[in-house]
Structure formats: C-alpha cells, structure tokens
UniProtKB/Swiss-Prot annotation:
The keyword tRNA processing does not apply. It comes from Mesorhizobium japonicum (strain LMG 29417 / CECT 9101 / MAFF 303099) (Mesorhizobium loti (strain MAFF 303099)). Zn(2+) binds at C430, C433, C454, C460. Its cofactor is Mg(2+); Mn(2+). Belongs to the NAD-dependent DNA ligase family. LigA subfamily. Transmembrane segments: none annotated. It is an enzyme of class 6 (ligase). One of its GO terms (molecular function) is metal ion binding. One of its GO terms (cellular component) is cytosol. Signal peptide: none annotated. InterPro entries: BRCT_dom, BRCT_dom_sf, DisA/LigA_HHH, DNA_ligase, DNA_ligase_AS, DNAligase_adenylation, DNAligase_N, NA-bd_OB-fold. This is DNA ligase.
Length: 734
C-alpha cells in the first residue's frame, strides 16, 4: 500500500505512523550497528528517517521520546562493558545529488551572511564504509576504545582495538592535548576479506558476506586474538572530547593525527566552492574501484573549527557537515537458474543464481527475486518495475549492491535475451514436501498476498529446519554454539525434528558425536578433492571426540528457563516479532495463560470480539495467534517443548500507593542519572502511565537539558514540569 502523504495525515494517523517508524527504524539500527546484518538499502533507510522527520515537523507535539531523530545507531550489544561518550558520536546529513551539495553550501553562506567578508573553506574526504570507533588518549597513551553504539553509549572494545597496527599505543611526536578522543573508521581491505574467506572455506568454516560486516564482527570478538588475526585497518578523521583543539581547522587537525602516528586518508583536500567539492567527489568516485577497500561517499565539512561551533547542530546531526553518497555500483551478468527456498513460515522465496560477477569489491553469485510478481516485473501494488520486463533463465541482467550491501536486479537487457528463453513458471507446490503452495487472500482488501506459501507446515522439512534455526537465534533463545550449520547437521541426522529435541541432545551424545564427525569428514573429503592432496593418518569417525560438546550442552541447559517474551518470539508464530512478543508477555504474564486465551480465541466464532483489547495487538496478530493455537498439530509440539522448558513468568511490580500512581507522565530532554528505559520502567513500577507525547491528559512532564517542543507545549497546557532531581526526590530515589 502506498504511503499517505504527510500533509494528508490526521493527528491520530501521524501518531500511529511515528510509532511504527520508531519501531521499524530501531530494528534496522539494531541490525546494522549491533548485529552487523542490514536488511534494507541505505536509500530505503534514509527515506524512513526523512518521513519520520517530516511528520515531526508538521506535528511537533507528537515527537516521541524514542524518536529516531533523538538517537544515532543502536544500543550497545550485550557482552561488552558500556562506555558513555563524553561528546556524542553523531550521524551526518545525506546528500545524493550535486544540487544537494549546493544547498548545503548555500545554507552555510546564508547563516554567516552577516559576516560579508568571511572566507568559508571546506574539506572533502572519502566516507569509509566500516565501523566507527572512538579512541581515548590520556597524556599520549591509549587508555580506552569504544564503538559508536547508539551515539551516546558504546561498547568497550579496548582490547580488540589494541590489536590493530594502525592504532598507536602511544602517540608520536608532541603537541597533543592532555586528553583527546580520536575518532575514525575500522575497516577491512578487499584483499584481507578474500584471504579470510579462503581460509574459512578451506577449514569448513562460515561464509562471510562483505568486508564491512566482517570488520564489525571481527571487532566485537570476545577473544582479542581473533580480532588480531583479521588484520583490520584504521583511518582517523575526527575527534570527540579534547582538552584543547588539535589545530584551528579541520584539515590541519587531521594532518596532526598523521604526525601523531595515525593513518589518514590521502584523498582529503581543502576546497572553497561547490565546484571544487563536486570535482573531488567525482575524482574519488573514479578511484573508488582501485582503492582496495569500501567507501560509500565523500564527506564535506566546514574547515574552520570556530565556524563549526557557531553553526552548531540540529536533530542529532552537525549542520556543518554532510555525506555525499555514491550511487550504487552496477555490473552485468547472466541468470543461470532460479531456485526456490522455503522459509520458516512456508514462504516460497525465489533466488536467481548468477554467473559470478564482482560489484564493489564483492563477488555476487545470488540475488533474491522476492516473489512471483517481482519475477514477472511488478511490485506488490501491481505497478511495473524494470519497465514491466520479467526475469528469465538465460537473461542478461544489470545488478547493483543496493547501499553497497544487498544485491538486486535493476534491469534486464532485453536485446541480449536468448531466443529460447521462456517465462519462468512459478511452482504451485512446495519443492521440498510437495504440499500445495497458495497465495492467501486478504479478507479486508480482497487482494492476493504477493507471496506463495507452502501449506505443509510441520510435515515440511524446510519449514521445520527454518523454525529450529529461528528458535535458537539471537533474539529468541540465543543458544551459543547451535548455529545454522549444527542445526542442519542434527536435523539431517534425525536427531532433532522439533525444538523439544534440542534439549535431549545431551542424552544422545554418541549419536551427536557421530553426526558432527561425519559432517567434518565430508567437508575434509571435499577439500581434498578440490586441492588434489591426500590426507594421512585419518582417524575413524568412532575415534573422534569433540570437547566442545560439553560447552554446547551447557549452553542448551542454560536456556531451560527463558524469559517469556523470548520464548514467545522463539515459537516463530507468523507476525509475532520481538516487540509484539514483549507486549503479549506483559499482557498475559505466563505461557499457560497465553495458551488458554489463544485456544479460546481460536475456537470462537468471532475471535476479534473474544481476544482482550491490547494496545499494539491488532487483527493481523490475533488471526496469527488463532492459526497457531487452533492447529492441533502444534499442541503436541508445544506440550513436548514445555516438558523441557519452563518460561519465567513476566512480572511487573506496581506500587499502587505511590505519589505518581495513576498519573500520565512524559519524559523529555536528556536524563543524566538514568537511561530513558530505566526511567520508564521506574514510573510504571510506581503505577504511572508513560506517554510519548504531551497532551491535555498529561499530568507531569520530567524535563532534562535539551527539552524542546514538549516543554513548550506543556507550559501552554498548564502541565506540571519538574527536572530529573525533583522527580527522583518525589519517588524516593534521590
């Protein structure tokens, strides 16, 4: 469905849209910054943020406390100590055309218009596509390093950063401030990435997607020796907290970094005009493919530090800097075949297998074709894509790595289409289990779903494997050591068919050992065949012992009492994501109560009138719960699972006699003694309701530094306003 124009949104529609955007963007931030696994292009992500900002500008009273405009990146991942940045690590505004760059320059000239004789200079440098890091030096000695995280709080990765040769343990030369935080980008070269992939393939290890994600994952290793083996690089380009400016200008400051022992970009230049900046942009773009590492644009900054300070910041971004993004790189190749993969909810996902081609330094061999309509040349709304030209086996296609991450087909070269190429016939049966694959009809719109789904459910091996992979994944039970490869091995060996079987693997240790040994033996034979070398002194399968099994079994046992929301998410119920699972856990408190209500709802003539009214749970989720709990085949699977796993009840302790019980509270601005989530949880425990926007129903506004439109609106409405210290005194936490 096409998005409704911002100018046409009602206040209630805008509020709902801001909620949706906050959740969706937070999910993408987490996948990009914390999990190193983005699922949308940079352009699509930027479009979401622009829409969010446009709605906020039209409805300033609806700005949420968790708004994307108030944060950068994602909260730091678990497993590392947290580091609060003394100076936030902000994102940059984006420019996509030369006209956008002109607008940036003109905004600066208008801002400084009162200084007619002011000579504004700029810098231009490549935007490295890696992982941002902040390095704290005290008296010239490296004492702490952190990731960007959410911009305010990052992860302490000091030990890992010390393994990077480009990061000096002690600054060279002299003249550095007593304390300075050097900021820059950790990245991996194409050569090192390909070497790592080759080493991993030879050892039967994991595959790696691209240099950016691999560098980020390498930097987050708990074992610093793993990071050291990855030969990561670092470019310095900025600074955070410092007791003194390195120099009067951006350019001179970065040159100082080189004097102190850092690598800096040799392509950084000064410029005075739009023409000079754009010329450098195109020069860097021409050299992009020969640099040996990923860049995704050029960053322009006002050169004079005094002018940077005067121009300031807006909505989490510096006004004095902009990132001019490159268009996605493209290449031409051929479609060799089209395969169908089956997901955990039965979705038939077509994948084009391509003649290998290098795009942006990465070899691309596969690209998703999304669904039946996409192959035919139409989007989910029936509108033409690729000029309405379908994709056929044998076609020559133009592909690009959207956002330099996700490969996609952008066009079909129709003049090169083979004479014998025929339209692709999308299967109407599951390629794995043979069950019918149907396109569901949306009861409200009467339209067909764009995706075909296998109706085999539990009898479909492909769905079973994907459900098992989901069950142990990071957002679900997060069982360490039980990744996709081990799940596949145990499933193919007949050791696990449902999630309950995972918890009895310890009892079948000999069979588990045999399955692992046979897999590794097969991998070794494949390497032997590829290399032409013959192994010597090969142990039999029965003679092998895997000490890591004890660790795996312990990890499995540690998940026998999971949090309720994680367990609900792990069940893999369609349309139940992490956020919805948390709402269900909070609403029903125990898995037994959720099952009871789910079965009652599924058995009702009109389920939507039976299911309790819960904020955040709509008809789509209710229908999904009915499908799951109303399916008798799921009963046995769930019963056996609950014999092995006892989810913890979701407990919310609420004080009904506190001073704020029953009141509606809004938090705004920067909280200095607790995080916003901690403040929200505290208020809810005390019986208060926490809202995201100020209205006539608001009883109390807790305002920290930087409070803006909410504070103004609260004053106009006569809402009581207090600061953080007063709030803590009022609730007895000072």
């Amino acid at each position: 469905m096409a998005e409704k124009p911002v100018d046409s949104l009602s206040e209630s529609e805008a509020e709902a849209e801001l909620k949706r955007l906050a959740e969706e963007i937070a999910g993408h931030d987490r996948r990009y910054h914390a999990e190193d696994a983005p699922t949308i292009t940079d352009a699509e992500y930027d479009a979401l943020r622009r829409r969010n900002l446009a709605i906020e500008e039209r409805f300033p009273g609806l700005v949420r406390e968790d708004s994307p405009s108030r944060r950068v990146g994602a909260p730091p991942a678990e497993g590392f100590a947290k580091v609060r940045h003394a100076v936030p690590m902000l994102s940059l505004a984006k420019a996509y055309t030369d006209e956008d760059v002109t607008d940036f320059i003109e905004r600066g000239r208008r801002f400084f218009d009162r200084d007619k004789d002011l000579d504004i200079a700029f810098t231009a440098e490549p935007k490295i596509d890696g992982l941002s890091a902040s390095l704290r030096y005290e008296n010239g000695v490296f004492v702490q390093g952190a990731t960007r995280g959410d911009g305010a709080v990052g992860e302490d990765i000091t030990a890992n950063l010390r393994t990077i040769a480009d990061i000096p343990a002690k600054l060279k030369g002299s003249g550095w401030p007593d304390v300075i935080e050097i900021r820059g980008e950790v990245y991996m070269t194409y050569a090192e990435f390909e070497a790592l992939k080759a080493r991993s393939a030879a050892a039967g290890g994991q595959d790696y997607v691209n240099p950016r994600n691999t560098a980020a994952g390498s930097l987050r290793q708990k074992d610093a020796s793993v990071t050291a083996s990855r030969n990561l690089k670092f470019f310095a380009y900025a600074w955070g907290f410092t007791t003194a400016d390195p120099a009067p200008t951006q350019y001179e400051s970065v040159q100082k970094f080189a004097d102190w022992g850092f690598k800096i970009s040799p392509l950084m230049v000064r410029a005075k005009s739009v023409e000079e900046l754009v010329a450098q942009y195109h020069l860097i773009e021409e050299q992009r493919s020969s640099l040996g590492y990923d860049i995704d644009g050029v960053v322009y900054k006002v050169d004079q530090l005094e002018l940077q300070r005067r121009w300031g910041f807006v909505t989490g971004e510096p006004r004095w800097a902009v990132a001019h993004k490159f268009p996605a790189e493209q290449a031409m190749t051929t479609v060799q075949k089209i395969d169908i993969q089956v997901g955990r909810t039965g979705t038939l996902a077509p994948v084009a297998r391509l003649a290998p081609v290098t795009v942006g330094g990465v070899v691309v061999e596969n690209v998703t074709l999304h669904n039946e309509d996409y192959i035919k040349g139409f989007d989910s709304n029936g509108l033409p894509i690729r000029d309405g030209i379908d994709v056929r086996i044998g076609d020559t296609v133009v592909i690009q790595r959207a956002g330099d991450v996700i490969p996609q087909i952008v066009s079909v070269v129709i003049d090169k289409r083979p004479a014998d190429a025929v339209p692709y016939e999308f299967p109407h049966t599951c390629p794995v289990c043979g069950s019918p694959a149907t396109r569901e009809i949306n009861e409200k719109t009467g339209k067909e779903d764009s995706r075909r789904r296998c109706t085999g459910e539990l009898i479909c091996a492909a769905q079973a494997v994907e459900r098992l992979r989901h069950f142990v994944s990071r957002g679900a039970l997060d069982i360490e050591g039980l990744g996709a490869e081990n799940i596949d091995t145990f499933f193919n060996a007949g050791l696990i068919k449902t999630a309950a079987d995972i918890f009895t693997l310890r009892d079948r240790r000999p069979a588990v050992t045999k399955a692992l040994a046979e897999r590794r033996e097969e991998q070794a034979r494949q390497r032997e065949a590829a290399s032409g070398k013959t192994r010597k002194n090969v142990r039999s399968v029965e003679d092998r012992n895997y000490e890591g099994l004890d660790k795996l079994f312990a990890a499995i046992d540690s998940r026998r009492e999971p949090e309720l929301d994680r367990f609900i998410f792990a069940l893999g119920i369609r349309h139940i994501g992490e956020t919805t699972a948390a709402v269900l856990a909070k609403t029903f408190s125990t898995i037994e109560e959720l099952i009871r209500v789910g079965k009652e709802t599924a058995a009702a003539e009109d389920p939507h009138t039976v299911f309790p009214s819960v904020n955040g749970i709509g008809d789509t989720v209710i229908d999904a719960l009915c499908d799951f709990f109303g399916n008798e085949r799921n009963d046995d699977v769930l019963d056996k699972l609950l014999e092995q796993v006892k989810p913890k009840p979701y407990i919310v302790t609420v004080s009904a006699d506190s001073e704020v019980a029953g009141k509606t509270i809004v938090f705004t601005g920067t909280l200095e003694k607790m995080t916003r989530s901690e403040a929200k949880a505290m208020a809810e425990r005390l019986g208060a309701k926490v809202a995201g926007s100020v209205s006539a129903k608001t009883d109390l506004l807790v305002a920290g530094p930087g409070a803006g439109s909410k504070l103004k609106l609260a004053s106009e409405l006569g809402v009581e306003v207090i600061d953080e210290d007063t709030w803590l005194q009022r609730v007895g936490k000072a």
